[in-house]
């Protein structure tokens, strides 16, 4: 570990649940040393909202942050993104949050993408990395639960909600869903796990990057591994034994694994075509037809997955989680005897799933990587004064960039648009707002009924209503 290594623990609050289409409201972050002692000044930022976006009223009910507050306290998104980049890109920084791999990191990527910042470099360049405390907490519960007070929901299932865990462990966490409060709570939980289960912490810290994870995976021998993931269900502690079968045919960062507690006989006997159809069918529909789920899963080695040698799941913890180790070993033997299983699973994943094509360039982050030439020119764009953006004289290879630039200018430098561009933007803006208006109004009505006896929530809803009405007028 580098002598200047540090964690940067962070959290977003936002105006919706979709990082591709929803906007950030608040960012908070704190730098710590390797033992989670705070070594930097807290960073708290609000992001000004743009006039082509309606916030989800549900989000305001959770966070208590209104768009008016963001516009009063906030900075424009290009500046907001640049300040975050400055923190994230300090050398030997490990960026970490609580569910950041699936949410906050995606919010970062899309925010950077809209503002001509490379969406990925911050997490690997200059010795940098990322990690997610949520999956480490899940792994601790499943594999080494001693020393932590665990929280449970009303059904007796383990709950990994940060506010429940902090309460169970006597960690101060007022104002849950305020970004800075959540950052302090994340730091305290990380420190607790490192103190109570140092070996577990160290193993998964070392194995957070894809190079180290790759060393654990042996598809030739189908060497079993223990895997912990929120996709696997709280009823079994989000934990299974898996056998790695093959690398994904088109995504070099994904390995196809088999859940060894699943229906292996079906996997072996059914055709790839039928299995593929079942794989993308809702579990409830399969149950109605009396069909078992396909026990296949993709593990993405670039998303800090929790993988460890099978023996890490001790017999007593397997029993506690309801995992039948002998049944899993019997299934592993069946897989190893199946001559065509690898070819079959590769065939299942060879055909890409079809998704609705997007008509919004801002949701097309994953449509390809930018070339080095485009990245260099985007860096120039970010530094240009507003009046030079219209006639920048730069050439771009990627067709997304001119449209992104148009949106960027329209949102943040509207006066740089000519008359034709202003008309184009107003049409785009009107269409986008109208598409979300019905859902916005339905949410306001439903929440007003739900919180009819809560003056604080009703006041927030009134502010959101007024904000939306002004945009839609």
Report residues per predicted region.
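N-terminal accessory regions of nucleic-acid-interacting proteins
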Residues: 1-6
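Short hydrophobic beta-strand that contains or immediately precedes a catalytic carboxylate
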Residues: 9-11, 259
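Short acidic, Gly/Ser-rich segments with clustered Asp/Glu that frequently serve as metal-coordination loops
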Residues: 13-20
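Metal-dependent phosphoesterase core characteristic of DEDDh/y 3'-5' exonuclease domains
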Residues: 22-25, 31-32, 37-63, 88-198, ...
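Metal-dependent phosphoesterase signature
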Residues: 63-80, 87
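Acidic catalytic cores of enzymes that act on phosphate-bearing nucleotides/polynucleotides
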Residues: 195, 206-286
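Long, charge-rich C-terminal accessory regions
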Residues: 249-425
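C-terminal non-catalytic accessory extensions
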Residues: 421-473
